[in-house]
């Protein structure tokens, strides 16, 4: 059950020509202007991540600037059936699919769980369905509607609500049963958002919630001080305006049996200090819902 970790790197020069991609260890990665890379890691039983690292992105949407780039994280869960959680930004099409095809046969993918449909997480859905039109897209009612409007091709779908389950069955090698429970989390930060909790690994997949715009080859939250300000700034910009929705989501999370890892859609996965980060969301949201004023500077 050891971790597997490697990255694929591609460097886009100023003239936008592309240097040949190659598999390399993280220690060999050299930061250059406009660099994109992909990191793969097994982080729990039958569960792995493909992290698309956008090292030099300087602005996200129109809300705020970025000082440390960002990542777009997607996930693979292999039970008896195979599920992908989220895809990536369209700019990562080549790198993301190269990595995905190393790990799985697209014809064996049964489900694509869509946490929410902002293009940085859903940008490759149409491409994936082209590889395998039999994939069942799982999401909230709004998410499925948004996907229809985005890709303009027919697809199989499964609408889910809070408290419903999707049983992927037991992995034939590990014996771990991956039963996915869905948690509605509207307005975090889009109205279509759902969380996915794997009862087999105690991993909660939250997409934007609990994330941060921080690009690093550190896979987990190994240095609390290093990422704290970016975590707080991200909360203030994206989650703070919907503080009451955050508190409602946390109430639902607190009913889960155990929380070992929060697999976020941006930045490092929260594993070493899960309770600390969750408590900060609760503290900040409680203050905002009471009308307490504060200013975040990052």
Please name every model-derived segment.
Residues 21-37, 106, 241-245, 249-298:
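Acidic/His-rich, metal-assisted hydrolase cores and their charged scaffolds
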Residues 35, 42-45, 138-272:
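Metallo-beta-lactamase
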Residues 40-104, 195-198, 202-206, 296:
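Conserved beta-strand hairpin/beta-sheet module of binuclear metal-dependent hydrolase folds
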Residues 80, 91-138:
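Active-site metal-binding motif and surrounding structural segment of the metallo-beta-lactamase
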Residues 89-90, 119, 211, 269:
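Short, glycine/acidic-enriched loop or turn micro-motifs at the edges of active sites
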Residues 1-20:
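N-terminal amphipathic/basic-hydrophobic helices that include classical n-h-c signal peptides
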Residues 85-87, 109-117, 137-140, 204-208, ...:
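Active-site neighborhood of phospho(di)ester-bond hydrolases with catalytic His/Asp-centered motifs
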